[in-house]
């Protein structure tokens, strides 16, 4: 009986909505988080969760039990954030302050964040065992070669016309 504490930090910013039906990053994030949550309950661990965007959207304190896991799963599926941006540093700082006892933390995000979060990652990793899981959709960086298209930043709402014929060269030249 391990009885460890596991925390899920789940990015609920607008960029998670990218992807095809059944393949959106939000669905992948929910599947990853649910898998970790079920694994934690099998190991008799406490599980908690923080939903974050550019603010702390919801904090679910760590608890044990099947009922608690089902609540977490329901929240993963149904939760609607108030904000659209991303602030990973804020989420890590909140978790580090809220959870005093050393825990295993899974940070599940696409890591689309205009802020520098390296220092917060370093501090959180010293206090807790931190595992970062990047949810990625290759279509975000590989535009179809269709000419002029209008793109919208889902987090900031700004729009821009892009010539995808030339953008394809820039995006795929890693």
Model-derived features with residue positions:
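Conserved strand-to-helix beginnings and helix N-cap segments that scaffold or border functional pockets
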Residues: 22, 117-118
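Von Willebrand factor
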Residues: 68-103, 115, 135-137
């Amino acid at each position: 009986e391990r009885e460890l504490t596991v925390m899920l930090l789940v990015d609920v910013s607008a960029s998670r909505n990218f992807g095809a039906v059944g393949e959106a990053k939000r669905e992948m994030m929910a599947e990853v988080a649910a898998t970790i949550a079920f694994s934690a309950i099998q190991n008799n661990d406490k599980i908690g969760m923080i939903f974050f965007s550019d603010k702390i959207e919801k904090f679910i304190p760590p608890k044990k039990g099947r009922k608690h896991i089902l609540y977490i799963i329901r929240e993963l599926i149904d939760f609607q954030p108030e904000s659209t941006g991303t602030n990973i540093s804020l989420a890590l700082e909140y978790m580090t302050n809220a959870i005093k006892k050393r825990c295993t933390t899974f940070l599940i995000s696409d890591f689309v964040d205009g802020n520098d979060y390296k220092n917060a990652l370093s501090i959180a990793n010293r206090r807790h065992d931190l595992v970062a899981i990047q949810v990625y959709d290759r279509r975000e960086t590989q535009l179809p070669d269709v000419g002029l298209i209008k793109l919208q930043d889902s987090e900031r709402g700004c729009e821009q016309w892009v010539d995808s014929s030339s953008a394809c060269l820039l995006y795929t030249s890693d």
